[in-house]
């Protein structure tokens, strides 16, 4: 174990790279260097890129002790004091090493005074007030459990899932098939199967929901997220070639870039059909600029769609401007007349039109296939993507610019 604080060597350059514009002055009174990692669940998610060759301690122990994964290698950083540790060895305990090298850490000191306190309670004591959490629900009219339960009056007989359990877990029935939504975070789930536990699914897909955190606590979310890390499905060896296509055309190009494809968020994007090189590039860029990875598939997909659009625009301009041998050696052929403005607008409107109702604009991205072909009103009626016929597990709202 060796110490590497943010005030030494490479630490200074890293701080200058990652701290600018991320609330250092605002949160200084709280003693937080990385406020975005103040949640234990969020710190645990950062370890999705933790090298599999690294020995213990486990990501769960790291996150519980205030550390999130910084990289490269086995470098971790405390969200509160900014202390960085690396060169972990078997038998090392994160809390012990934290106390050994950074004894003045505010988070560590408060944790020692109140071992049972959650991150949110500790942060509230840092600032002398309640933790900064907005409890503005997306659907405040469904904040009462009895109102959510009333929404299940027309719950289909064929649908799996107990309405009382679903309502108690924050979900209300949307009125379409077996689609439910969380009143607070707007997270939507469908295609319920026998044995699915609403709270577990809530923590699996929407771990940052404040209602979930308030009712179940960080320990529950941590256990659910930890089970995802240990799941055989997350192992590269068990993933199909359609996810990890190692052909030169799609390879990110370097072992360092390959590391960014190990997270569950990256794997979901790859399953949607996005290029490995583009996914790795975006995740790597975000990590270098902010010091953290994407926390949700929707954020990554939004950036991927923008990046693809920019790439296509650049390629079309390059192709139109690049002369070819044929253009220099042969007389130009008659080209089709340019499209009128009205025709261009008609085609653009047609591309953005919902392929089901043929009326409203497309706005819902299906998971896991990634197709964007229907509007908000038509999406709940579908169980399979109309393009590829893949089963729809979830959907993400997309905003067209």
Swiss-Prot record:
Listed result of changing residue 235 to A: Abolishes phosphorylation, but no effect on caspase inhibitory activity. No effect on protein stability or anti-apoptotic activity
GO MF term set: cysteine-type endopeptidase inhibitor activity; cysteine-type endopeptidase inhibitor activity involved in apoptotic process; ubiquitin protein ligase activity; zinc ion binding
Impact reported for residue 254 to A: Abolishes phosphorylation, but no effect on caspase inhibitory activity. No effect on protein stability or anti-apoptotic activity
UniProt modified residues of type Phosphoserine: 231, 235, 247, 251, 254
Zinc finger (RING-type): 354-389
Effect of residue 251 to D: No effect on caspase inhibitory activity or auto-ubiquitination activity. No effect on protein stability or anti-apoptotic activity
GO biological process, alphabetically ordered: apoptotic process; negative regulation of apoptotic process; positive regulation of protein ubiquitination; protein autoubiquitination; regulation of cell cycle
Compositionally skewed regions (Basic and acidic residues) per UniProt: 324-333
Coiled-coil intervals: none
Function statement: Weak apoptotic suppressor. Has E3 ubiquitin-protein ligase activity. Weak inhibitor of caspase activity.
UniProt name for this protein: Baculoviral IAP repeat-containing protein 7-A
Lineage: Eukaryota, Metazoa, Chordata, Craniata, Vertebrata
């Amino acid at each position: 174990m060796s110490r590497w604080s943010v005030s030494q060597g490479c630490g200074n350059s890293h701080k200058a790279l990652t701290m600018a514009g991320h609330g250092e002055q605002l949160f200084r009174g709280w003693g937080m260097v990385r406020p975005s990692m103040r949640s234990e669940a969020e710190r645990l998610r950062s370890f999705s890129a933790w090298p599999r060759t690294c020995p213990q301690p486990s990501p769960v122990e790291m996150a519980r002790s205030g550390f999130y994964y910084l990289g490269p290698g086995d470098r971790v950083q405390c969200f509160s004091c900014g202390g960085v540790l690396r060169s972990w060895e078997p038998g090392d305990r994160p809390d012990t090493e934290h106390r050994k090298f950074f004894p003045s850490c505010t988070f560590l000191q408060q944790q020692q005074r109140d071992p049972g306190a959650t991150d949110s309670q500790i942060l509230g004591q840092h600032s002398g007030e309640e933790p900064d959490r907005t409890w503005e629900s997306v659907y405040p009219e469904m904040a009462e459990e009895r109102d959510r339960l009333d929404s299940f009056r027309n719950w289909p007989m064929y649908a799996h899932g107990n309405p009382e359990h679903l309502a108690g877990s924050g979900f209300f029935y949307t009125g379409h098939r077996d689609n439910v939504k969380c009143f607070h975070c707007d997270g939507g789930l469908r295609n319920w199967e026998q044995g699915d536990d609403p709270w577990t699914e809530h923590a699996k897909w929407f771990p940052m929901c404040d209602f979930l955190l308030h009712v179940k606590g960080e320990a529950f979310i941590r256990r659910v997220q930890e089970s995802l890390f240990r799941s055989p499905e997350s192992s590269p060896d068990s993933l199909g070639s359609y996810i990890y296509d190692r052909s030169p055309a799609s390879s990110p190009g370097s072992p360092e870039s390959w590391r960014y494809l190990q997270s569950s968020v990256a794997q979901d994007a790859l399953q949607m059909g996005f290029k490995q090189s583009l996914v790795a590039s975006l995740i790597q860029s975000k990590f270098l600029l902010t010091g953290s990875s994407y926390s949700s598939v929707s954020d990554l997909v939004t950036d991927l769609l923008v990046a693809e659009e920019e790439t296509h625009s650049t390629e079309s301009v390059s192709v139109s401007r690049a002369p070819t041998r044929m253009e220099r050696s042969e007389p130009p052929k008659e080209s089709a007349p340019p499209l009128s403005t009205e025709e261009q607008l008609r085609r653009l409107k047609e591309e953005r039109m919902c392929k089901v109702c043929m009326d409203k604009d497309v706005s819902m991205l299906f998971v896991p296939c990634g197709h964007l072909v229907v509007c908000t009103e038509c999406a709940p009626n579908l169980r399979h993507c109309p393009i590829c016929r893949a089963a729809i597990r979830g959907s993400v709202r997309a905003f067209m610019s």
